Amino acid sequence: MLFDKQRWQEFAAGYSIFDCTIFDKHRFVCLSYEITDSPHRDPLPRMRLLLVRASRPLDAKRFVLNEYGNFGFARVSSNLTPMEFAAVDTSGHVFSYDAARAEEEPEHPRDLASSDLAGVVNQVVRIGQSIYTVGGPRRLHKRLGVGQWQDLSKNVPWPKDVATPGNGLKYMWRDASGFSESDIYVAGGEGDVMRFDGQKFSKVAFPSNELLHNVHCAGDGRVYIGGNMGSLYVGRENTWKKLAGGDFSVPWKDIAWFAGKLWCGSDYGLWTLEGDKLVRAQVPADVQLTSGVIDISPDGKHMLTAGPDGASLFDGKNWQVLFSRHDFE
């Protein structure tokens, strides 16, 4: 058991998981928010970043908790070289943790060259051996170190209508994934997909202008893109095919390739792609209740998934429910 009742009350009770990241089967991070009754997030609910070291004894040494009250919606990712995790919210607040430090950093860059607009961070991802942030309008940054972010989108094609009122979502990138750090796909906005070769961006001829939420460069050599209300596309460069219509009430939170198949996670659990058809994942019921966001360990051996009420771990053969709110509340 990852928690006992005492540690649950101390570290997790009253909080809902929003994102997660995994180093290996023994070390992972859950980003969660305080459960409140405020319909307008005013004041902001408190954010917790809980580092779990599952191989340690069930005492305070198993958990490292950091808590903040000034973060909006944040996402988190991790890296092994150096071993660290970083969380960034939509307004550019940054928290990072490594062996020597755990603290809030200077804000993530938000200024847009030759513009009065401010950038927004929507996602934090690991590509290759680096952490990247994705946002809008058309923003991609690579983490170089504490307080250091390389703006890769300086030379991205800049639409003439980006500042037109009502176009706030049109170029709002929401996700990025790469076969390598010189073959990255970025997606979001209204069918706004680009490929980055490590030096420059090129526009991808995508067949839809629907709002896009996810992109994943998969182990089968293809790129999968998740659209509005759970639609799914597959392709690469300028050739694409729609696999599934947007028949769900919510978009995917994450899509990922693991154990030879594509996994899609949402507020309602996990789906897998079988052939060219999306089906409800054949996993235990308690796993479905503790799934949604997805992260794959850097060595590719474990998949961590988490939902508001808990988290589960998969090694390609066996599932382990790490914890569930239903066991304690």
Go through each PLM region and give its residues.
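Residue-level hotspots at or immediately adjacent to binding/recognition sites across diverse folds
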Residues: 1-329
